[in-house]
């Protein structure tokens, strides 16, 4: 039986556009995410 294709096709530009820093800073909720990750001491804040 044939399975479908793999669903994760890595693409750095799309990754940044969907989960990137500029996108997070656009909305109040996104800024809250970044500040929470800063507070927690995350090595990486966004994709």
UniProtKB/Swiss-Prot annotation:
<keyword id="KW-0689">Ribosomal protein</keyword>
<dbReference type="InterPro" id="IPR000271">
    <property type="entry name" value="Ribosomal_bL34"/>
</dbReference>
<dbReference type="GO" id="GO:0005840">
    <property type="term" value="C:ribosome"/>
</dbReference>
<dbReference type="GO" id="GO:0006412">
    <property type="term" value="P:translation"/>
</dbReference>
<comment type="similarity">
    <text>Belongs to the bacterial ribosomal protein bL34 family.</text>
</comment>
<dbReference type="Pfam" id="PF00468">
    <property type="entry name" value="Ribosomal_L34"/>
</dbReference>
<keyword id="KW-0687">Ribonucleoprotein</keyword>
<protein>
    <recommendedName>
        <fullName>Large ribosomal subunit protein bL34</fullName>
    </recommendedName>
</protein>
<dbReference type="GO" id="GO:1990904">
    <property type="term" value="C:ribonucleoprotein complex"/>
</dbReference>
<dbReference type="InterPro" id="IPR020939">
    <property type="entry name" value="Ribosomal_bL34_CS"/>
</dbReference>
<dbReference type="GO" id="GO:0003735">
    <property type="term" value="F:structural constituent of ribosome"/>
</dbReference>
